[in-house]
Amino acid sequence: MKDKIWLKNYPDGVNSLANINEYNSFTEFLDDGFKNYSDLVAFENMGKTITYKELNTLSKNFSLYLTEELKLKKGDRLIIQSPNVLQYPIALFAALRSGIVVVNTNPLYTQNEIQHQFKY
């Protein structure tokens, strides 16, 4: 097994191993993180921040929009074409908590590359 060279960059006290057996689903894992770190900054961009609590609330709301208004369902694909802004993790976690497959695209993709992204 190769060394996990990135672990040397972890701050003191950060557990290097997640016990995946603690969770029944990825959503349960996310919810636990949102709860345990609710007051901490999750993301920062262009001088703005979003806490885990805010991310949880906003992603739940957007998840409802995706499933109730747009009628997306588990296994559907959602293409996200976004720069690194705070809206990206909201959309990402909304889709993941709904079982929607996230497909990231690049604005520089050709038509053929974008069409390939839509294939299942």
Regions found by a protein language model. Give the residues of each.
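Conserved AMP-binding/adenylate-forming
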Residues: 48, 65-112
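Short glycine-/small-residue-rich flexible loop motifs, especially phosphate/cofactor-binding loops
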Residues: 31, 92, 115
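N-lobe entry segment of adenylate-forming
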Residues: 1-50, 54-69, 74, 98, ...
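Short, intrinsically disordered, charge-balanced linker/junction segments flanking boundaries
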Residues: 114-120
